[in-house]
Each structure stands twice: as C-alpha cells, then as structure tokens.
Amino acid sequence: MSYREYRDRVLNFIEDHEHWRAHTINLIASENVTSPSVTRAVASGFMHKYAEGWPRQRYYQGCKYVDEVELIGVELFTKLFGSDFADLRPISGTNANQAAFFGLTQPGDKAIVLHTSHGGHISHMPFGAAGMRGLEVHTWPFDNEAFNIDVDKAEKLIRELEPKIVVFGGSLFPFPHPVKELAPVAKEVGAYVMYDAAHVLGLIAGKQFQDPLREGADIITASTHKTFPGPQGGVILYKKFGETEEIAKLQWAIFPGVLSNHHLHHMAGKVITAAEMLEYGEKYAAQVVKNAKALAEALAEEGFKVIGEDKGYTESHQVIVDVSDLHPAAGGWAAPLLEEAGIILNKNLLPWDPLEKVNEPSGLRIGVQEMTRVGMFEDDMKEIAHFIRRVLIDKEDPKKVRRDVYGFRAEFQKVYYSFDHGLPLRE
C-alpha cells in the first residue's frame, strides 16, 4: 500500500464516521456536536499558530489576531458565568483540574473528592491528577438512596480531616451537589472549594442547574464539549479569592505549569460557543433538562429501572438506568447491543457496585444534550425509549432496530441553538 493510499484510508474512515454518527442516536453524556460556525473556527489557520502566556504578553510574536479572539473569549465567559476571571487556556477538563491541584495545593495536602463508584472523575483519584500532585485523597460519604453526598457525614469529615481542598462535581451527575451546605464548613477549616463542572457547564451557563460560584465555590474547572457544546478543551473560572499571590500561583500552574501552547483553534471555537450560549443558552439548557426528564419517564414506563424516581429522576442532562436485572453482565451486555442498533451510550458503575465490576457494571449512563442540539423534543425521547426497550427487553434483532433508528435520526441533521440555524421548531 502506498502512503497516498494510507492518506485515502484515513480520509475515508473520517467520512464513514461522520455519516455513521449523523445517523445514530448519540446518548454519550460526555459528547456533543458543534455548530458550523464553531467547526469553521476549529478548522481555521489558528491551528497553525503557537502562543504562550497571556494575550498581549506573549513569548511569541505574530499573535495580534489570536490575542483579540482570546480577549473576546475572556469577556464572554466572565459575562456568561458571572466570574471575575476566565482562563481559556486549559486544553481539557483534566488539564484544568491538574492546574487547580498544582496551583492551590502542595504534595501531602488532603483532598476530599467523590469516589469513582459514586460518579467521581478519574482525575480526582489517587491514580489521576490529584494523586500525581501527591495529594492524600479521601472520598465524600455518599447516600445511595439520595444519589448524592451525605451532608451530615460530610460536615464531620471536613472538620475531622481539615483538607486543603474539597472537590464537587463528577461524571455521574444527575443532581446538584450540596455546595451551599458544605462550602462554609470547608472554609472554616481553610479549604479551597473546587467545582468540576465538566458535565454540567452548559446547564450552568443556561441557568438550569446550581450556580457554584454563588453557592460558595472558589473555582470552577470544566471541559467545553459536553453540555457546553463547544470543541474539546477546558476552562477555569473563578471569583476573587484569597490573596493576589494565590491567584498568581493558579495562573502560573496553568502556564508554564501544565501546558505551553493552548491549541488556539480550539480556543477560537470556545469563544464562538460562548457567544452562542449567551444568545441561546437558556432555551437550550432548559430543553436539555426537559428532554432528560422525558426520557427517564419514558424508560420507566417501558419497564426499565431508572434511578432517582422519588426526585424526578434527574435535574441535569443525565439519565441513569440500572440494567442488572436484565442480564448477568448488565451494562457490559447492554451498551454493545445498543450500539449494534445505532444507539450509543456507555456502561457505568453505580454507587453500590464494587470497582471490580467496572467491565460489567450495573448501570447505563445516558445524556440527551446532543440529541437536544439537533432539534429533538420530549416526544422524540419517547421514541428513543421505545427503541431501547425493543433491543434490551423485547430482545428484537438490533440490526432490524438499526434500520428504524437510521430513518428516525435522518430527520435531525441541523445543529440548532446556534447562529447558523437558530432555534428548532416543534412539529
């Protein structure tokens, strides 16, 4: 095979992927789709440029245009989230978490985070960014019934450990975390309050979730490609806290600490996404939550065990389903089978699962943000729930269901809540 043929194969795989994705029901809770305008920015000549440091204070020449874009981004992000500062340089959510841990803590400091089985992100763990910083990692007490942090036990743990940092947020995140209740306790013992908003950043921007900075968080870290429908990347947002020296340490941890150049084409895409969210974000986020609730209710009606019934199932983009009663391999069986039908989601540990069950966990994690962005409403969630039932409960041939999924999804080919296509219209 010639090298040109390798090139052709790669381009063909990309084309195949794009067609496949446009005709699947993508319910991965950590993904989204960008608008044509954002896609244009990411594919721009900004990808060829290198920049280090702050706008207008670069270590490289030739940055006058990228500087202007980044300054617009700082303006838009601070307006969108009501923060005093916005740093668009992190290149992922984990990279933002690294910067926060390195800027605000020292090796040997104590941290309280959410356990992986309870929805905590791997970067918060001893084997992730927190551990790489040398933190002594402890986990929040968790109430399995409430599917949330146990506030009373958490208060006691904070006072007992006197941690340097406490971390809210995670990857399994159907309900707001008790920031307002626990932030004052953390600050009593001198701890920083960090909120990892990777999954819910778009809902916060759209005023449909808790407002961490107003509830007591010192700093928000996040990725920019989940409910916030931008390109893959990260961001750090914070109010003024502590001494100027502390903020300087945080900024120093970002550059030169955990990154140098910050992928300027993705930065430009983040900026346009922030503008889209200022224009359309409240309507988008509200519909995301409506769709999540509608899907949860529809799945329950179809016979699935949906977590959180007594709390309205969800207040975010996520729906959590326990499929352990359907097959011994549970999520490890269900997710691949649904993929055959063109329904893409992921298996997930539930709070009562031991870590050893990571490959065959009890749960499925479902996110509706991307299907919302392509114009789906509550009635469409009922269709999706029925597709899932046909595969997992009725044991229908996934390939047969795939044909119906393909036809259903073909009707949703525009990206709404954007300057390119505006708002979707209900049928």
From Swiss-Prot:
GO terms for biological process: glycine biosynthetic process from serine; tetrahydrofolate interconversion. GO terms for molecular function: glycine hydroxymethyltransferase activity; pyridoxal phosphate binding. Its cofactor is pyridoxal 5'-phosphate. Its EC number is 2.1.2.-. The modification N6-(pyridoxal phosphate)lysine is found at K226. InterPro entries: PyrdxlP-dep_Trfase, PyrdxlP-dep_Trfase_major, PyrdxlP-dep_Trfase_small, Ser_HO-MeTrfase, Ser_HO-MeTrfase-like, Ser_HO-MeTrfase_PLP_BS, SHMT-like_dom. Transmembrane segments: none annotated. Its main location: cytoplasm. It is found in: Cytoplasm. CDD domains: SHMT (cd00378). The record marks H225 as: Plays an important role in substrate specificity. Keywords: Amino-acid biosynthesis, Cytoplasm, One-carbon metabolism, Pyridoxal phosphate, Transferase. It is an enzyme of class 2 (transferase). Pathway: Amino-acid biosynthesis; glycine biosynthesis; glycine from L-serine: step 1/1. (6S)-5,6,7,8-tetrahydrofolate binds at G120, H121, I122, E243. Homodimer. Catalyzes the reversible interconversion of serine and glycine with a modified folate serving as the one-carbon carrier. Also exhibits a pteridine-independent aldolase activity toward beta-hydroxyamino acids, producing glycine and aldehydes, via a retro-aldol mechanism. Belongs to the SHMT family. This is Serine hydroxymethyltransferase. It comes from Thermococcus gammatolerans (strain DSM 15229 / JCM 11827 / EJ3).
